[in-house]
Amino acid sequence: MDTREFPLDRTRNIGIMAHIDAGKTTTTERILYYTGKIHKIGETHDGASQMDFMDQEKERGITIQSAATTAIWHGFHEQWKDTPYRVNIIDTPGHVDFTIEVERSLRVLDGAIAVLDGAAGVEPQTETVWRQATTYAVPRLVFVNKMDKMGADFQMSVDSLKERLDVNAKAIQWPIGAEDDFAGVIDLIQREAWYPDDKLGTEWEKRPIPDDLKDLVEEKRDELIEAVADVDDSLMEKYLGEEEITVDDLKAAIRRATLALKFYPVLAGSAYKDKGVQLLLDAVVDYLPSPLEVRPYTATDPDTGDEVDLKADDKKPFAALAFKIMTDPYVGRLTFLRVYTGTLKSGSYVQNTTKDTRERVGRLLQMHAITRREIDEVFSGDIAAAIGLKATSTGDSLTSVDRPLVLESMEFPDPVIQMAVEPKTKADQEKMAEALQKLSEEDPSFHAETNSETGQTLISGMGELHLDIMVDRMRREFNVDVNVGTPQVAYREAFTKTVQAQGKYIRQSGGKGQYGDVWIEFSPNDEGKGFEFDNAIVGGAVPREYIPAVEQGLKEAMQSGPLAGYPLVDLKAKLYDGSYHEVDSSEAAFKIAASMSLREASKTAGAVILEPIMKVSIVSPIDNLGDVMGHVSARRGMIEDQETHGNTVTVTSKIPLAEMFGYTTTLRSATQGRGTFQMFFDHYEAVPRNVQEDIIKNAGKE
């Protein structure tokens, strides 16, 4: 048996998350450089970054797929020279169309670094990823990056954490200067000033704290101690008893408070200028949890329904979550795993409890962005990739064959935008089907379906960029050229009233007839709850073997709603009565009866069309505020908030997606190219009646 290279207490599984352009990938690059993983630093804006390994990422300078990497850290002062730490890093995208990747990564991480742009502080997408991290109870450090940038303001960035996220966050470092004068950082805990000694920031020199910063350092250190003492009893005792608080006391209290999600340490630096990244790595070791310190993951025993806590332990049976599927040009299908308990050797079998199948793991790989190292065994707390799992998809539980468990799965958002694609040539037809299947396996927020009546293929996803990139990947990775239609909004339909309806199907045409009869009560379900079927039949009015056919008949009928043919969603159906015929009843007859019942109900159930409402954040020069407010109201939008930073203003609003097509051009021309906007899905809501009539008319169902 292989022995574990790094004990669990010296392992960190972390993610790097941020708003687009806050410098996340550059920060990861520097971490890899300082931990000895790369010998040459790649810049994102040169298209040479190690973590951004897909062609589109290199061209667009944004991170799309979260790559997993392993790095080894000996400490800024080589303090862990003989006992280094292993840091597994997942680089996540900051672009809103790819929130699925962030969600997917956070589910399997133990800690995270939130990167802020020092000139902007907390931005809209920061709020989204922060909320996601809170959902999964992930402890975080905050790295205020780009301190060398025009307008960089560390105090503003720290304050924005309290103002916009309402969290207890305080600086544990202070920058020496800002913008062009950003020279180094002061460690508030140790009261030390650090200046880089060479261009790439590998050598640093400790100097006395500059005189003009001494008072500020003491003031900020006191603020730090108070903020931590507020949430940590043992530090509070020392603080109130006016006992001496040593460096070790303070560090231990910061660690406890960070792991308890009661405190978020804030650090300063500039990854691009090679300042502050090693101290950030030290903070990862000092303040983020090992797999032993996170709250145990919950799994369920499929036989008893009992909950089981999964605590990292190599001696326990194997349990892991498949959190990402990728197609690799050289080795084929890769399944990324987060191992919670136990160990797994290559060549052994695992039980996929989500799909109830057994699969053999061919090979195991440790990934470094795009290069890989073959390993014989993975241990609890590890992140690795497996080859050979053909049936496994994202969110599946993989456990030992002798001890099957089902891990809490991942939830994926429904797509909000769709467009038609068609292959350019007959030869592309088959390749397109294969490409779409592989892409939707990799990305659960990307869907592809072919309409059986029209033969048209629709792809749907989280935004225009998302779909652009998928079409691009079809061309590059699968050699499929497609023509694309204009993007369309993914509307839905829903009932607003509770109604009861009968569906009775009788057919007599010589020989065996058909008979199915059901009474179903339909009622609206909460948003996002989907379809819920309740079998309330007593006394066998509908025999048990036909119940699944009724449910299936409803599901199929819901694919095309009564108003304009959009999917019917969020519906409860209670089957409470019906009748059958000894000879003529069949599954097919009950399926048809169920769909007739739904069609009948839709006449009186107050059906409405739902549209995706986006949260839109528009940043523009303050002189154009009037234009922007006009844009929002002209697009059926509601303004929620506006904030002024210097001579720019940020307007946050909710606007229907249908009104946002082409807005980039409108905003650009109104602001001479200086305005930008970001939008992400917020919720679905009913469209106004006049809009609904237009949608129905356009769908040709009037």
Swiss-Prot record:
- Which residue range or ranges hold the tr-type G domain? 9-292
The principal localisation class reads cytoplasm
Q: Which annotated residues bind GTP?
A: 18-25, 91-95, 145-148
Looking at the keywords, is Protein biosynthesis present?
A: yes
Q: Where in the cell is it found?
A: Cytoplasm
| One Pfam short name | GTP_EFTU
Give the GO terms filed under biological process for this record.
ribosome disassembly
Per its UniProt record, what InterPro entries does this chain match?
Answer: EF-G-like_DII, EFG_II, EFG_III, EFG_III/V, EFG_IV, EFG_V, EFG_V-like, G_TR_CS
Q: Which SUPFAM superfamilies match?
A: EF-G C-terminal domain-like, P-loop containing nucleoside triphosphate hydrolases, Ribosomal protein S5 domain 2-like, Translation proteins
Q: Which GO-annotated molecular functions does the record name? A: GTP binding; GTPase activity; translation elongation factor activity
Task: Give the GO cellular component terms, alphabetically.
Answer: cytoplasm
Give the record's keywords alphabetically: Cytoplasm, Elongation factor, GTP-binding, Nucleotide-binding, Protein biosynthesis
- Function field: Catalyzes the GTP-dependent ribosomal translocation step during translation elongation. During this step, the ribosome changes from the pre-translocational (PRE) to the post-translocational (POST) state as the newly formed A-site-bound peptidyl-tRNA and P-site-bound deacylated tRNA move to the P and E sites, respectively. Catalyzes the coordinated movement of the two tRNA molecules, the mRNA and conformational changes in the ribosome.
What the record says about family reads: Belongs to the TRAFAC class translation factor GTPase superfamily. Classic translation factor GTPase family. EF-G/EF-2 subfamily.
What is the protein's name according to its record? Elongation factor G
Name the encoding gene, please: fusA
